[in-house]
């Protein structure tokens, strides 16, 4: 890339090197399967809890009306805002979400810093952990009155 092109896209090399470093860290973590599964399950738990908050806010506003107008659109915005916080909490808790790992693994495969086997192991462990966290919250909610 020429010096002139680098000025046009200053973050390109920085972003790619950051993603490749993240891939190396994630690959090392996947070697510690139990710990990696815990981080992935935590992301699933956070996602599920904030989805319940999103659903609750949306349904709460859908039941309200002011001047004959339903507040459902405001509820959808409030619910989406609450759900957006899930991604922030996942980031700050250093949990592992499958969607971010797909981006990291794709960049790693493109630049040939990882192989298909390592990539599939990483994605498989992350998916399993995310589903375990989601499943745990689902089982807990089935036995509660929160969704009534």
Kindly give the residue locations of the regions a language model identified.
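Alpha-helical transmembrane segments and their helix-helix packing motifs
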Residues: 2-148
